[in-house]
């Protein structure tokens, strides 16, 4: 692909290499390292003048370091006379802080959007924002990709299902569950829950005809897995035959791996928007999001529809 440069951040270089490979490109020669005092150093070692530059950084842990790295890389690119700059952020951190749920708190998702634009991005590519409304925090084009087609394709090829039902772990994820259910040709269920404080959830009940079925719980993020495991236990108690979990972003914080390992969940399927390979455990299966992002980049460059990837 002519006229395109791909710059990889350090947070998920394997994914960046896969995306570049899909497009038949190599990664641009760039030095991203840390000074002895902890400051981030960015240096682009080849000309990018007049190119469409895609900077790929997933805002994984350490989140603040990777966010600052993204901003500095965008600034370095902006000062190098490119034709256009696209920030590719497979996992958009701070997305769960998208409103003031209590007095005197920041809207962190909006601030991150402002910083990315100020640093120089002309366009943003993201995958499964926690709240789709975050797109409205940007004043530049946002290509909001969804991993549902990728997860569906993997499930179809690798999981034998006789009588499935897709379950959303909360009311906010119903659209995601419906999209997957439509592809699988099955019904949906919804978990009703109350979250008393951050990172803790109390699962209440499930709406839907689930008895005797194979439940596929679908979510955007698996963090500490408390909600997910509680949902799985509830479904088993309500009579489902099997439980499979899938999500776009596998953070797996704190006790997540232990919880999932000891849970009734048979498989945990996530994409590689985050570098999950170091947290590999027996139930984990990882599917690459690179072809989806790569195809979106190709279509942007060709001026063809990106949204048709999901319809």
Curated annotation (Swiss-Prot):
Pathway of this protein?
Metabolic intermediate biosynthesis; 5-phospho-alpha-D-ribose 1-diphosphate biosynthesis; 5-phospho-alpha-D-ribose 1-diphosphate from D-ribose 5-phosphate (route I): step 1/1
Binding-site residues, Mg(2+) 2: 170
Protein name stated in the entry:
Ribose-phosphate pyrophosphokinase
Q: Which NCBIfam families match?
A: PRK01259.1, ribP_PPkin
The entry's function note states: Involved in the biosynthesis of the central metabolite phospho-alpha-D-ribosyl-1-pyrophosphate (PRPP) via the transfer of pyrophosphoryl group from ATP to 1-hydroxyl of ribose-5-phosphate (Rib-5-P).
Q: Which GO terms describe its biological process?
A: 5-phosphoribose 1-diphosphate biosynthetic process; purine nucleotide biosynthetic process
Query: Is Repeat given among the entry's keywords?
Result: no
Q: Tell me which residues this entry annotates as catalytic.
A: 193
| UniProt binding sites for D-ribose 5-phosphate | 195, 219, 223-227
User: Family per UniProt?
Assistant: Belongs to the ribose-phosphate pyrophosphokinase family. Class I subfamily.
Q: Which reaction does it catalyse?
A: D-ribose 5-phosphate + ATP = 5-phospho-alpha-D-ribose 1-diphosphate + AMP + H(+)
Q: Which UniProt keywords apply?
A: ATP-binding, Cytoplasm, Kinase, Magnesium, Metal-binding, Nucleotide biosynthesis, Nucleotide-binding, Transferase
Q: Where does ATP bind?
A: 37-39, 96-97
InterPro entries tied to this protein: Pribosyltran_N, PRibTrfase_dom, PRTase-like, Rib-P_diPkinase, Rib-P_diPkinase_bac
Which branch of life, at top level?
Answer: Bacteria
Compartments annotated for it: namely:
Cytoplasm
| Cofactor: record remark | Binds 2 Mg(2+) ions per subunit.
The cofactors it requires, by name, are: Mg(2+)
Task: Supply the source organism for this entry.
Answer: Aquifex aeolicus (strain VF5)
One function term, GO molecular function aspect: magnesium ion binding
